């Protein structure tokens, strides 16, 4: 699909100028010098460890249509858009491209569960219009490079779209939301994330409100009615349609447009359009909450209840997010392994422990350090150790310096280990057997998937001897 001419592309970017033939048109946008090719506009991004301008001679040899750069080598002949900052230009161009398309676009943010909610919505949209007619963020391409590249994938055949907005510093959500131009803004929750950079949970909630502020007057805001910070999002949505949601139980009922009750994997949903009974394939109350968020967003985008049900029931766990696997190593063979290794913060750790607590004994928590917790690190880790003990978890195995505090708070039955090899060896020696359930979780830098890989392989592997990353 032909995108912009260089003249039209430069018009989307403040301060841009064109050298060479400005009538040249491009078909795709690339930021990877290794895969750029004919028909591409190559955008040279400067990163922390590289500068793609250094690879422009190789890019020229790949016969790209044009480049977008801050500078060019001497004797450069490939048509070019010149800008002061290529990263900002990438976003401006993506914003211009997104505005070529009039379709429902859902933007998802929140402290925990946003990738799962995004994937649930993508599954619902695929059920509604087919996978080829819906655009969805691939993986977690949710930052100021990943989101523009996602938006550049929009084409005329798309009828629905869902994108994920990531954040770890103040102001990022506002920037990304302006690029996305959402018609539906989803805030899944506000919890203790990125506390090294976001001083309070209220600051997190206000940051997430930026996606609602990016709505046009015709847009719809989606958020949990029972969240402590719902009032912030309700004020942000003044003048917009609101579809709020709540997961209720015998102890607590919250009035909301979309309400659900959950028992094991059976989710009963009441909506303004009617009732749904959905059998989820994923674990935990928090995934029932995620399903209500996805349902609300889909309703806002005009999707039928039938497609919502089909999409939710066909949805499986996202990699590294409460994936159920089976141990195969030694005495652990046959044990259930819950792989929740993608990332961790105090609230997602507590939610995962709740899932573990619902299983039969022996229940084993295998945890790594939680990152980006700032000065609250010791207190947060002690909280998790104490919570695991309170919820009846039978044993705690921890790796990483900060997790020593979790072991101290847990008390008897806690084991702190130096590396993955020692951890796996101790798990085998403990003799938990096939009836056990192991929950493995930690922040991304801990690479706790190495533990999962080790225990789900019938033979010891190289991951078992790799020291923990710090």
Q: How would you name each of these model-derived features?
A:
Residues 67-74, 225-228, 247-250, 400-404, ...:
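Short, polar loop motifs at secondary-structure junctions
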Residues 2-109, 116-127, 145, 152, ...:
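Short, basic phosphate-binding NTP loop
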Residues 118-122, 258-276, 323:
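Acidic-glycine-rich active-site phosphate/pyrophosphate-binding loop
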Residues 76, 89-225, 229-238, 433-434, ...:
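Phosphate-binding loop of NTP-binding sites
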Residues 56, 60-61, 177-178, 389:
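Non-catalytic positions within long, well-ordered alpha-helices that form the structural scaffold/packing
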Residues 77-86, 239-246, 256-259, 410-418:
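Active-site regions of enzymes building and remodeling cell-envelope glycoconjugates
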Residues 1-18, 36-41, 47, 51-54, ...:
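ATP-dependent carboxylate-amine ligase
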Residues 9, 40, 59, 93, ...:
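Residue-level signal for inorganic ion chemistry
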């Amino acid at each position: 699909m032909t995108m912009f001419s260089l003249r039209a592309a430069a018009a989307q970017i403040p301060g841009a100028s064109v050298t060479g033939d400005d009538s040249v048109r491009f078909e795709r946008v690339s930021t990877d010098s290794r895969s750029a090719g004919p028909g591409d506009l190559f955008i040279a991004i400067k990163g922390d460890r590289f500068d793609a301008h250094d690879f422009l001679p190789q890019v020229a040899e790949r016969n790209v249509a044009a480049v977008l750069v801050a500078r060019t080598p001497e004797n450069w002949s490939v048509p070019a858009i010149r800008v002061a900052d290529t990263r900002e230009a990438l976003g401006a161009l993506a914003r211009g491209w997104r505005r070529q398309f009039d379709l429902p676009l859902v933007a998802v943010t929140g402290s925990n569960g946003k990738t799962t909610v995004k994937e649930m919505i993508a599954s619902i949209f695929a059920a509604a219009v087919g996978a080829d007619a819906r655009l969805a963020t691939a993986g977690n391409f949710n930052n100021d490079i990943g989101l523009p590249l996602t938006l550049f994938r929009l084409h005329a055949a798309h009828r629905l779209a869902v994108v994920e907005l990531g954040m770890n510093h103040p102001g990022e959500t506002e920037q990304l939301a302006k690029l996305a131009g959402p018609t539906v803004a989803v805030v899944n929750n506000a919890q203790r994330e990125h506390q090294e950079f976001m001083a309070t949970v209220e600051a997190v909630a206000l940051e997430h409100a930026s996606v609602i502020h990016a709505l046009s007057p015709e847009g719809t805001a989606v958020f949990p009615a029972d969240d402590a910070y719902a009032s912030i999002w309700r004020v942000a949505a003044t003048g917009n349609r609101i579809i709020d949601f709540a997961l209720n139980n015998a102890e607590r009922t919250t009035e909301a447009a979309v309400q659900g009750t959950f028992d094991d994997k059976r989710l009963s949903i009441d909506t303004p359009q009617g009732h749904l009974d959905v059998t989820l394939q994923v674990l935990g109350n928090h995934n029932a909450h995620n399903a209500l968020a996805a349902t609300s967003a889909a309703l806002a985008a005009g999707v039928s209840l039938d497609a919502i049900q089909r999409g939710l029931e066909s949805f499986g766990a996202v990699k590294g997010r409460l994936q159920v696997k089976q141990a195969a190593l030694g005495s652990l063979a046959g044990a259930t392994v819950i792989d929740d290794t993608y990332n961790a913060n105090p609230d997602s750790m507590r939610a995962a422990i709740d899932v573990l607590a619902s299983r039969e004994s022996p229940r084993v928590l295998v945890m790594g350090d939680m990152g980006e917790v700032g000065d609250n690190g010791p207190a947060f880790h002690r909280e998790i150790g104490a919570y695991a003990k309170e919820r009846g978890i039978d044993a705690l195995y921890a790796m990483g310096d900060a997790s020593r505090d979790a072991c101290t708070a847990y008390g008897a039955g806690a084991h702190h280990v130096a590396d993955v090899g020692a951890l796996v060896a101790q798990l085998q020696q403990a003799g938990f057997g096939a009836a056990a359930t192991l929950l493995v979780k930690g922040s991304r830098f801990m690479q706790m998937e190495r533990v999962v890989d080790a225990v789900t392989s019938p033979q010891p592997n190289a991951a078992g001897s790799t020291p923990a990353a710090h």
